[in-house]
Amino acid sequence: MSESLHLTRNGSILEITLDRPKANAIDAKTSFEMGEVFLNFRDDPQLRVAIITGAGEKFFSAGWDLKAAAEGEAPDADFGPGGFAGLTEIFNLDKPVIAAVNGYAFGGGFELALAADFIVCADNASFALPEAKLGIVPDSGGVLRLPKILPPTIVNEMVMTGRRMGAEEALRWGIVNRVVSQAELMDNARELAQQLVNSAPLAIAALKEIYRTTSEMPVEEAYRYIRSGVLKHYPSVLHSEDAIEGPLAFAEKRDPVWKGR
């Protein structure tokens, strides 16, 4: 892997650190490399959870590398099969990703965090989508994912004026799961990752699949859909060894041993 990405495997947890001084900005080359990492994570049966963070204490990521843009990299450049930052367009990832936001998450950096399943941020973190002030739009998920969380008036202000949102406000709006000190950030993210590892992998995959396929459906239609047999993971959960192991472990007062089948 390149000098821009540092990978650490802790059992079934993969930690990815973006390290591109000074602002952890992402060009097309780095985006391709991040895509390879996330696709390998998706396909590795030994890995259960990924944590993505930035090096240093100031920037999670400033988003698209404007130096690369100034040198000719186009806004519609090929950023790889996972989309910008390697994650924003992987729509079949059935393992959870935690964004440990250690500082500013601007533009594509904010969009990378929004593509994760959980956001844990340091109390000095700040979020913004300033693309309109640069003559472009946040089309790597920001303008699509943020309206699913925030009211339209707040979204409009963020995407049209580029206003920043601090960590505590992001927590109040439900953008982030937790706000902790900078010193506690990675330990807190690892604690959350371990909690996810303690849950059955097939159940996690089924939950992500259900969210992904039914989020825009009326509840009654969604019920019919998930019980129609078209989903991959939900029927597997119902007839899995893990579905037997969970209640058995509870009855025997021990931790379950998940097999993922």
Curated annotation (Swiss-Prot):
The keyword Lyase applies. Pathway: Amine and polyamine metabolism; carnitine metabolism. GO terms for biological process: carnitine metabolic process; fatty acid beta-oxidation. It catalyses: (R)-carnitinyl-CoA = crotonobetainyl-CoA + H2O. The keyword Lyase applies. It is an enzyme of class 4 (lyase). CDD domains: crotonase-like (cd06558). Its EC number is 4.2.1.149. Disulfide bonds: none annotated. Pfam families: ECH_1. InterPro entries: Carnitinyl_CoA_dehydratase (IPR022852), ClpP/crotonase-like_dom_sf (IPR029045), Enoyl-CoA_hyd/isom_CS (IPR018376), Enoyl-CoA_hydra/iso (IPR001753), Enoyl-CoA_hydra_C (IPR014748). Coiled coil: none annotated. Keywords: Lyase. One of its GO terms (molecular function) is hydro-lyase activity. The active site is at residues 111, 131. PANTHER family: ENOYL-COA HYDRATASE, MITOCHONDRIAL (PTHR11941:SF54), ENOYL-COA HYDRATASE-RELATED (PTHR11941). Catalyzes the reversible dehydration of L-carnitinyl-CoA to crotonobetainyl-CoA. Belongs to the enoyl-CoA hydratase/isomerase family. This is Carnitinyl-CoA dehydratase.
